[in-house]
């Protein structure tokens, strides 16, 4: 099972640092410069749930060709067995070229997530890790620097990947300081 999604647009700018505190007890802040420009990048990603490894690519826009390239990379990275790709309901996921590609690759089965249930797609949670690893506290001049940061961050996250599970982990059992025993 693979979760696929798009992130973006990511514009070249200064991103806020990760939450943290300085040695003297103040929040770490950075001067932020925000501007809207034509130079931006979209990040396409696929998360393999069983081992936590991800596959990313960047593109200049969010369209059918970018998603088609992501599907090709997913099929090449997982050469055997059926692939169930969990995806959102974007129109580019159901376009004509995608349907033709899916007909040529019968082992790839798209599974659309229900409307309003993006939390079911674990790729959304993985984007949070990528943003923190690639963008936090960084300044980018153009889309090529964003592409480089995404590739490096994906490699670092894949190096320490673990299987993903839906739901929250069980809380650790509390240890009581006193044990009360009642007698009748």
Can you describe what each PLM-predicted range is?
Residues 95-105:
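Short, aromatic/basic amphipathic alpha-helical patches
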Residues 65-84:
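Short, basic/hydrophobic alpha-helical segments
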Residues 3-5, 46, 52, 71, ...:
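Mobile genetic element proteins and their domesticated derivatives, centered on retroelements
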Residues 123-145, 156-158:
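Active-site proximal helix-loop segment of RNase H-like, two-metal nucleases, encompassing DDE(D)
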Residues 1-69, 171-179, 183:
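Extended, low-complexity cationic-aromatic segments
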